[in-house]
Protein backbone atom coordinates (compact mmCIF):
# COMPACT_ATOMS: atom_id res chain seq x y z
CA UNK A 1 0.00 0.00 0.00
CA UNK A 2 1.30 3.48 -0.83
CA UNK A 3 1.91 5.11 2.50
CA UNK A 4 4.81 6.89 4.15
CA UNK A 5 6.06 8.06 7.50
CA UNK A 6 5.10 11.54 6.39
CA UNK A 7 1.66 12.79 7.39
CA UNK A 8 -0.98 11.56 5.01
CA UNK A 9 -4.05 13.42 3.80
CA UNK A 10 -7.73 13.24 4.60
CA UNK A 11 -10.45 15.07 2.72
CA UNK A 12 -14.23 14.80 2.22
CA UNK A 13 -14.13 16.42 -1.24
CA UNK A 14 -15.48 13.42 -3.12
CA UNK A 15 -17.84 13.12 -6.06
CA UNK A 16 -19.67 10.31 -4.29
CA UNK A 17 -21.82 10.96 -1.18
CA UNK A 18 -20.88 7.73 0.57
CA UNK A 19 -17.18 8.59 0.34
CA UNK A 20 -17.93 11.97 1.90
CA UNK A 21 -19.66 10.23 4.81
CA UNK A 22 -16.81 7.75 5.22
CA UNK A 23 -14.29 10.57 5.46
CA UNK A 24 -16.48 12.52 7.88
CA UNK A 25 -16.30 9.57 10.25
CA UNK A 26 -12.56 9.54 9.61
CA UNK A 27 -12.11 13.09 10.87
CA UNK A 28 -14.28 12.33 13.90
CA UNK A 29 -12.08 9.33 14.65
CA UNK A 30 -8.84 11.24 14.10
CA UNK A 31 -9.88 14.09 16.38
CA UNK A 32 -10.81 11.60 19.12
CA UNK A 33 -7.81 9.35 18.55
CA UNK A 34 -5.88 10.40 21.64
CA UNK A 35 -8.82 9.80 23.96
CA UNK A 36 -9.64 6.44 22.33
CA UNK A 37 -6.03 5.24 22.57
CA UNK A 38 -5.31 6.53 26.10
CA UNK A 39 -6.29 3.24 27.84
CA UNK A 40 -3.69 1.41 25.74
CA UNK A 41 -0.89 3.81 26.73
CA UNK A 42 -1.01 3.72 30.56
CA UNK A 43 1.54 6.00 32.17
CA UNK A 44 2.53 7.41 28.78
CA UNK A 45 1.70 10.59 26.91
CA UNK A 46 -1.62 10.42 25.10
CA UNK A 47 -0.82 9.83 21.43
CA UNK A 48 -1.53 12.57 18.93
CA UNK A 49 -1.78 12.33 15.17
CA UNK A 50 -0.69 15.94 14.67
CA UNK A 51 -3.65 16.75 12.44
CA UNK A 52 -2.94 19.78 10.22
CA UNK A 53 -6.28 21.36 9.41
CA UNK A 54 -5.09 23.27 6.32
CA UNK A 55 -7.66 21.99 3.85
CA UNK A 56 -7.52 20.80 0.27
CA UNK A 57 -7.71 23.13 -2.71
CA UNK A 58 -8.81 21.57 -5.99
CA UNK A 59 -8.05 23.87 -8.91
CA UNK A 60 -11.01 24.10 -11.30
CA UNK A 61 -10.86 24.73 -15.05
CA UNK A 62 -13.52 26.79 -16.86
CA UNK A 63 -14.84 23.57 -18.41
CA UNK A 64 -15.14 21.90 -15.01
CA UNK A 65 -16.70 24.78 -13.08
CA UNK A 66 -20.32 23.62 -13.20
CA UNK A 67 -19.43 20.09 -12.08
CA UNK A 68 -17.22 21.45 -9.29
CA UNK A 69 -20.00 23.69 -8.00
CA UNK A 70 -22.39 20.73 -8.03
CA UNK A 71 -19.91 18.62 -6.03
CA UNK A 72 -19.48 21.40 -3.48
CA UNK A 73 -23.25 21.74 -3.13
CA UNK A 74 -23.56 17.98 -2.55
CA UNK A 75 -20.71 17.97 -0.02
CA UNK A 76 -22.18 20.91 1.90
CA UNK A 77 -25.60 19.23 1.98
CA UNK A 78 -23.91 16.42 3.92
CA UNK A 79 -22.30 18.80 6.40
CA UNK A 80 -18.88 19.28 4.80
CA UNK A 81 -17.25 22.71 5.03
CA UNK A 82 -16.30 22.89 1.36
CA UNK A 83 -16.62 26.24 -0.40
CA UNK A 84 -16.36 27.19 -4.05
CA UNK A 85 -14.14 30.19 -4.67
CA UNK A 86 -14.38 31.92 -8.02
CA UNK A 87 -11.23 33.25 -9.64
CA UNK A 88 -11.21 36.58 -7.81
CA UNK A 89 -11.97 35.12 -4.39
CA UNK A 90 -9.36 32.41 -4.97
CA UNK A 91 -6.67 35.01 -5.69
CA UNK A 92 -7.71 37.07 -2.68
CA UNK A 93 -7.38 34.13 -0.30
CA UNK A 94 -4.25 32.63 -1.85
CA UNK A 95 -2.36 35.53 -3.48
CA UNK A 96 0.66 33.32 -4.25
CA UNK A 97 -1.46 31.19 -6.62
CA UNK A 98 -1.54 31.71 -10.40
CA UNK A 99 -5.25 31.72 -11.26
CA UNK A 100 -5.11 33.01 -14.85
CA UNK A 101 -6.26 29.71 -16.38
CA UNK A 102 -8.67 28.81 -13.56
CA UNK A 103 -12.39 29.40 -13.14
CA UNK A 104 -11.93 28.98 -9.41
CA UNK A 105 -11.24 26.37 -6.80
CA UNK A 106 -12.96 23.98 -4.41
CA UNK A 107 -11.53 24.50 -0.93
CA UNK A 108 -12.15 22.60 2.29
CA UNK A 109 -12.26 25.39 4.85
CA UNK A 110 -12.47 23.08 7.87
CA UNK A 111 -11.92 19.42 8.83
CA UNK A 112 -9.51 18.76 5.97
CA UNK A 113 -5.78 18.28 6.03
CA UNK A 114 -3.19 15.63 6.84
CA UNK A 115 -1.99 13.64 9.83
CA UNK A 116 0.68 11.21 11.06
CA UNK A 117 0.09 7.91 9.28
CA UNK A 118 2.59 5.93 11.36
CA UNK A 119 1.02 7.28 14.54
CA UNK A 120 -2.33 5.92 13.38
CA UNK A 121 -0.83 2.55 12.42
CA UNK A 122 1.09 2.19 15.68
CA UNK A 123 -2.01 3.09 17.68
CA UNK A 124 -4.06 0.48 15.82
CA UNK A 125 -1.40 -2.16 16.41
CA UNK A 126 -1.01 -1.39 20.09
CA UNK A 127 -4.75 -1.46 20.74
CA UNK A 128 -5.18 -4.67 18.74
CA UNK A 129 -2.40 -6.47 20.61
CA UNK A 130 -3.86 -5.34 23.93
CA UNK A 131 -7.16 -6.92 22.87
CA UNK A 132 -5.50 -10.24 22.08
CA UNK A 133 -4.64 -9.92 18.39
CA UNK A 134 -1.50 -11.80 17.32
CA UNK A 135 0.59 -10.42 14.46
CA UNK A 136 2.43 -13.06 12.40
CA UNK A 137 5.38 -11.84 10.33
CA UNK A 138 5.08 -14.26 7.44
CA UNK A 139 3.88 -14.56 3.85
CA UNK A 140 0.68 -16.32 2.82
CA UNK A 141 1.38 -18.84 0.06
CA UNK A 142 -1.93 -20.70 -0.16
CA UNK A 143 -5.52 -20.97 1.02
CA UNK A 144 -7.43 -24.19 1.63
CA UNK A 145 -11.10 -24.05 0.59
CA UNK A 146 -13.63 -26.71 1.62
CA UNK A 147 -17.42 -26.57 1.34
CA UNK A 148 -17.38 -22.97 0.09
CA UNK A 149 -15.28 -21.72 3.01
CA UNK A 150 -11.62 -20.90 3.56
CA UNK A 151 -10.59 -23.36 6.25
CA UNK A 152 -6.87 -22.68 6.59
CA UNK A 153 -4.00 -20.47 5.50
CA UNK A 154 -0.60 -21.82 4.48
CA UNK A 155 2.47 -19.72 5.30
CA UNK A 156 5.84 -19.57 3.55
CA UNK A 157 7.48 -21.39 6.48
CA UNK A 158 5.14 -24.34 5.98
CA UNK A 159 2.91 -23.55 8.95
CA UNK A 160 -0.84 -23.89 8.54
CA UNK A 161 -3.20 -21.57 10.42
CA UNK A 162 -6.88 -22.46 10.77
CA UNK A 163 -9.34 -19.85 9.62
CA UNK A 164 -12.79 -18.74 10.79
CA UNK A 165 -13.02 -15.61 8.65
CA UNK A 166 -10.43 -14.42 6.15
CA UNK A 167 -10.20 -10.70 5.35
CA UNK A 168 -8.25 -9.94 2.20
CA UNK A 169 -6.62 -6.62 3.08
CA UNK A 170 -3.44 -7.33 1.13
CA UNK A 171 -3.24 -3.92 -0.53
CA UNK A 172 -1.52 -4.00 -3.93
CA UNK A 173 -1.22 -7.80 -3.63
CA UNK A 174 -4.96 -8.30 -3.11
CA UNK A 175 -5.34 -10.04 -6.47
CA UNK A 176 -2.60 -12.52 -5.55
CA UNK A 177 -4.55 -13.51 -2.44
CA UNK A 178 -7.85 -13.65 -4.32
CA UNK A 179 -6.26 -15.92 -6.93
CA UNK A 180 -5.45 -18.46 -4.21
CA UNK A 181 -9.18 -19.24 -4.12
CA UNK A 182 -9.65 -19.02 -7.89
CA UNK A 183 -11.15 -15.51 -7.69
CA UNK A 184 -10.18 -12.39 -9.58
CA UNK A 185 -10.50 -8.70 -8.70
CA UNK A 186 -9.32 -5.71 -10.77
CA UNK A 187 -6.97 -4.41 -8.07
CA UNK A 188 -3.37 -4.01 -9.22
CA UNK A 189 -0.27 -2.16 -8.03
CA UNK A 190 0.27 1.23 -9.68
CA UNK A 191 3.49 3.10 -9.00
CA UNK A 192 3.40 6.53 -7.38
CA UNK A 193 6.41 8.77 -6.80
CA UNK A 194 6.72 11.26 -3.96
CA UNK A 195 9.24 14.07 -3.70
CA UNK A 196 10.09 16.28 -0.73
CA UNK A 197 11.69 19.55 -1.80
CA UNK A 198 12.97 22.84 -0.44
CA UNK A 199 12.02 26.15 -2.02
CA UNK A 200 14.23 29.23 -1.97
CA UNK A 201 11.09 31.36 -1.78
CA UNK A 202 8.61 30.52 0.99
CA UNK A 203 4.86 30.38 0.46
CA UNK A 204 3.25 32.75 2.98
CA UNK A 205 0.26 31.97 5.13
CA UNK A 206 -1.63 28.77 5.76
CA UNK A 207 -1.05 26.73 2.60
CA UNK A 208 -3.55 23.96 1.79
CA UNK A 209 -2.87 20.81 -0.19
CA UNK A 210 -3.11 22.18 -3.74
CA UNK A 211 -4.28 19.83 -6.49
CA UNK A 212 -3.42 21.32 -9.87
CA UNK A 213 -5.28 20.79 -13.14
CA UNK A 214 -2.33 18.63 -14.23
CA UNK A 215 -2.96 16.22 -11.35
CA UNK A 216 0.16 17.35 -9.50
CA UNK A 217 -0.41 17.98 -5.80
CA UNK A 218 1.74 19.91 -3.34
CA UNK A 219 1.48 20.75 0.33
CA UNK A 220 3.76 21.98 3.11
CA UNK A 221 5.78 19.46 5.12
CA UNK A 222 7.25 21.50 7.95
CA UNK A 223 9.67 23.93 6.29
CA UNK A 224 9.70 21.75 3.17
CA UNK A 225 7.05 20.65 0.67
CA UNK A 226 5.69 17.28 -0.44
CA UNK A 227 4.59 16.72 -4.03
CA UNK A 228 3.60 13.96 -6.43
CA UNK A 229 1.39 13.17 -9.40
CA UNK A 230 0.00 10.39 -11.55
CA UNK A 231 2.82 9.25 -13.86
CA UNK A 232 2.29 9.73 -17.57
CA UNK A 233 2.87 6.03 -18.20
CA UNK A 234 0.55 4.96 -15.39
CA UNK A 235 -0.45 1.32 -15.49
CA UNK A 236 -0.12 -1.95 -13.59
CA UNK A 237 3.38 -2.45 -12.21
CA UNK A 238 5.34 -5.48 -11.12
CA UNK A 239 4.65 -6.31 -7.48
CA UNK A 240 8.32 -5.82 -6.58
CA UNK A 241 9.05 -2.77 -8.76
CA UNK A 242 9.80 0.23 -6.56
CA UNK A 243 12.33 1.94 -8.84
CA UNK A 244 11.83 5.69 -8.89
CA UNK A 245 11.93 7.88 -11.98
CA UNK A 246 13.54 11.19 -11.09
CA UNK A 247 12.77 12.60 -14.52
CA UNK A 248 9.10 12.62 -13.48
CA UNK A 249 9.93 15.53 -11.19
CA UNK A 250 12.12 17.40 -13.66
CA UNK A 251 9.92 16.93 -16.72
CA UNK A 252 6.38 17.08 -15.35
CA UNK A 253 6.03 17.95 -11.67
CA UNK A 254 8.31 20.97 -11.41
CA UNK A 255 6.90 22.71 -14.52
CA UNK A 256 3.38 22.23 -13.15
CA UNK A 257 4.41 23.55 -9.73
CA UNK A 258 6.15 26.59 -11.19
CA UNK A 259 3.16 27.41 -13.38
CA UNK A 260 0.66 27.19 -10.53
CA UNK A 261 2.85 28.68 -7.76
CA UNK A 262 5.44 31.06 -9.28
CA UNK A 263 7.35 31.14 -5.98
CA UNK A 264 8.50 27.61 -6.82
CA UNK A 265 11.03 28.83 -9.39
CA UNK A 266 14.06 27.53 -7.47
CA UNK A 267 13.63 24.11 -5.85
CA UNK A 268 15.89 21.38 -4.49
CA UNK A 269 14.71 17.80 -4.02
CA UNK A 270 15.65 16.58 -0.55
CA UNK A 271 14.07 13.13 -0.54
CA UNK A 272 12.11 10.86 -2.86
CA UNK A 273 10.55 7.42 -2.85
CA UNK A 274 8.21 5.13 -4.75
CA UNK A 275 5.21 3.23 -3.43
CA UNK A 276 2.28 1.29 -4.84
CA UNK A 277 -1.36 2.26 -5.01
CA UNK A 278 -3.79 -0.67 -4.68
CA UNK A 279 -5.66 0.59 -7.69
CA UNK A 280 -9.18 -0.61 -8.46
CA UNK A 281 -9.21 -0.33 -12.24
CA UNK A 282 -13.00 -0.71 -12.46
CA UNK A 283 -14.12 2.45 -10.67
CA UNK A 284 -11.40 3.81 -8.32
CA UNK A 285 -13.43 2.73 -5.31
CA UNK A 286 -12.91 0.14 -2.61
CA UNK A 287 -14.29 -3.37 -2.42
CA UNK A 288 -15.84 -4.28 0.94
CA UNK A 289 -17.80 -7.37 1.90
CA UNK A 290 -18.02 -11.14 1.71
CA UNK A 291 -17.77 -13.12 -1.49
CA UNK A 292 -21.22 -14.56 -2.35
CA UNK A 293 -19.93 -18.13 -2.87
CA UNK A 294 -16.88 -18.38 -0.61
CA UNK A 295 -18.88 -17.24 2.35
CA UNK A 296 -16.15 -16.44 4.88
CA UNK A 297 -13.82 -14.71 2.40
CA UNK A 298 -14.08 -10.94 2.81
CA UNK A 299 -12.63 -8.14 0.72
CA UNK A 300 -11.26 -4.83 2.00
CA UNK A 301 -9.32 -3.66 -1.03
CA UNK A 302 -8.87 -1.02 -3.69
CA UNK A 303 -8.94 2.15 -1.60
CA UNK A 304 -5.63 3.73 -2.57
CA UNK A 305 -5.85 7.44 -3.16
CA UNK A 306 -8.20 7.61 -0.20
CA UNK A 307 -7.29 4.53 1.83
CA UNK A 308 -5.66 5.80 5.00
CA UNK A 309 -8.26 8.47 5.64
CA UNK A 310 -11.07 5.97 5.12
CA UNK A 311 -9.54 3.12 7.12
CA UNK A 312 -11.42 3.87 10.38
CA UNK A 313 -14.83 3.59 8.70
CA UNK A 314 -13.85 0.58 6.59
CA UNK A 315 -12.36 -1.19 9.61
CA UNK A 316 -15.55 -0.57 11.53
CA UNK A 317 -17.62 -1.89 8.62
CA UNK A 318 -15.53 -5.06 8.35
CA UNK A 319 -15.95 -5.65 12.09
CA UNK A 320 -19.71 -5.22 11.81
CA UNK A 321 -19.95 -7.74 9.00
CA UNK A 322 -17.93 -10.30 10.95
CA UNK A 323 -19.82 -9.79 14.23
CA UNK A 324 -23.37 -9.15 13.00
CA UNK A 325 -23.46 -10.25 9.38
CA UNK A 326 -24.60 -6.80 8.27
CA UNK A 327 -23.56 -3.14 8.41
CA UNK A 328 -24.78 -1.47 11.59
CA UNK A 329 -23.68 2.16 11.22
CA UNK A 330 -22.72 3.30 7.72
CA UNK A 331 -24.09 1.18 4.89
CA UNK A 332 -21.22 0.31 2.54
CA UNK A 333 -23.29 -2.02 0.37
CA UNK A 334 -22.41 -0.05 -2.81
CA UNK A 335 -18.82 -1.30 -2.36
CA UNK A 336 -19.92 -4.95 -2.47
CA UNK A 337 -17.94 -7.51 -4.47
CA UNK A 338 -20.94 -8.35 -6.66
CA UNK A 339 -20.53 -5.12 -8.63
CA UNK A 340 -17.10 -6.36 -9.74
CA UNK A 341 -18.46 -9.63 -11.09
CA UNK A 342 -21.32 -7.77 -12.82
CA UNK A 343 -18.97 -5.10 -14.25
CA UNK A 344 -21.09 -2.33 -12.72
CA UNK A 345 -18.77 0.57 -11.78
CA UNK A 346 -19.50 2.67 -8.71
CA UNK A 347 -17.34 5.56 -9.82
CA UNK A 348 -15.29 7.93 -7.70
CA UNK A 349 -13.76 10.80 -9.67
CA UNK A 350 -11.87 12.69 -6.96
CA UNK A 351 -8.83 10.47 -6.41
CA UNK A 352 -5.37 12.05 -6.30
Regions found by a protein language model. Give the residues of each.
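Helical element adjacent to the flavin cofactor pocket in flavoenzyme catalytic cores
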Residues: 101, 106-165
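Mid-domain beta-loop-alpha active-site segment that forms a flexible
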Residues: 105-127, 171-173, 249-256, 303, ...
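C-terminal catalytic lobe of FAD-dependent flavoproteins
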Residues: 117, 255-352
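Central helical "cap/lid" subdomain
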Residues: 157-206
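Active-site lid/adjacent beta-loop-alpha segment flanking the redox-cofactor pocket in flavoenzymes
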Residues: 199-296
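Short beta-strand to alpha-helix junction loop
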Residues: 21-24, 58-67, 107-126, 241-249
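Dinucleotide-binding Rossmann-like beta1-alpha1 core, especially the glycine-rich loop
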Residues: 2-93, 215-217, 257
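A short coil-to-beta-strand element that immediately follows conserved catalytic motifs
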Residues: 51-53, 135-137, 186-192, 262-274, ...
